[in-house]
């Protein structure tokens, strides 16, 4: 299917419509909050969601009804897959070199496998590097042990099971609190990008018969 010329790649981070769709999480938050958040947390693989969040925060500021955009974008990766984290901490727009075999090895050992992207839109104009600079943001890391810990803590506290990638964001929030990077009176948006799998599985499975079968002949 992917090799069929009639089907085109949707463009990833360069697809404006995709970014607009991903950025609606900020719109929903502001609708409830009544203002632009002070801090935004998200786990990143490509960083497109964080880019989209920042773009929408800028639009909300231009609208004028939701206050100034002082939203610091705080993102996180699952170690040892730390390409963007390493580049950011080195204050570099360029990602460090990573051999394909080493990239695959790191991708295999992390729990949040969806965060393993070897070619993210990090250093391009308007990419994640620019977003972190413009927002005075920062990067965090979460180990597999951190993910398991915060998965259980969130389930016990909120009654909801998160996917590993979302737990990376929760871990980043906890680190930021410990390091004094967020204030007690600040408005915080924590983007929990997925969950509910355990709850859904506990209800069992229903295999639906197909409504239409197309013969390969």
What is the predicted role of each segment?
Residues 1-10, 17, 59-161, 205-217:
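Active-site/ligand-binding loops adjacent to catalytic centers
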Residues 1-64, 148, 152:
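Active-site/ligand-binding-proximal alpha/beta "capping" segment
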Residues 10-13, 42-45, 74-77, 189-193:
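Short beta-strand segments
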Residues 21, 52-53, 84-88, 200-202:
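Short, well-ordered secondary-structure micro-motifs
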Residues 29, 40-41, 73, 132, ...:
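Buried hydrophobic positions in well-ordered alpha/beta secondary-structure cores of metabolic enzymes
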Residues 38, 71, 185-187:
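Nucleotide donor/acceptor-binding cores
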Residues 44-47, 158-166:
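Short glycine/threonine-rich catalytic loop with a Thr-x-Gly-x-Asp
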Residues 170-217:
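Catalytic phosphate/nucleotide-handling subdomain of diverse soluble enzymes
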């Amino acid at each position: 299917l992917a090799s069929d010329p009639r089907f085109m790649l949707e463009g990833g981070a360069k697809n404006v419509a995709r970014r607009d769709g991903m950025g609606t999480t900020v719109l929903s938050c502001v609708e409830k909050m009544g203002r632009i958040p002070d801090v935004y947390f998200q786990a990143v693989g490509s960083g497109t969601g964080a880019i989209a969040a920042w773009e929408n925060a800028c639009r909300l500021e231009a609208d004028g009804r939701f206050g100034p955009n002082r939203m610091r974008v705080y993102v996180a990766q699952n170690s040892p897959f730390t390409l963007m984290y390493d580049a950011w901490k080195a204050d570099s727009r360029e990602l460090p070199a990573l051999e394909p075999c080493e990239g695959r090895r790191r991708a295999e050992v992390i729990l949040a496998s969806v965060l393993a992207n070897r070619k993210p839109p990090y250093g391009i104009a308007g990419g994640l590097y620019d977003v972190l600079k413009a927002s005075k943001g920062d990067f965090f890391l979460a180990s597999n042990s951190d993910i398991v810990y915060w998965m259980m803590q969130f389930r016990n506290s909120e009654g909801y099971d998160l996917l590993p990638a979302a737990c990376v964001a929760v871990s980043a929030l906890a680190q930021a609190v410990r390091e004094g990077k967020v204030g007690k009176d600040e408005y915080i948006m924590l983007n929990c990008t997925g969950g509910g799998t355990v709850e859904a599985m506990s209800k069992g499975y229903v295999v639906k018969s197909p409504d239409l079968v197309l013969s390969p002949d």
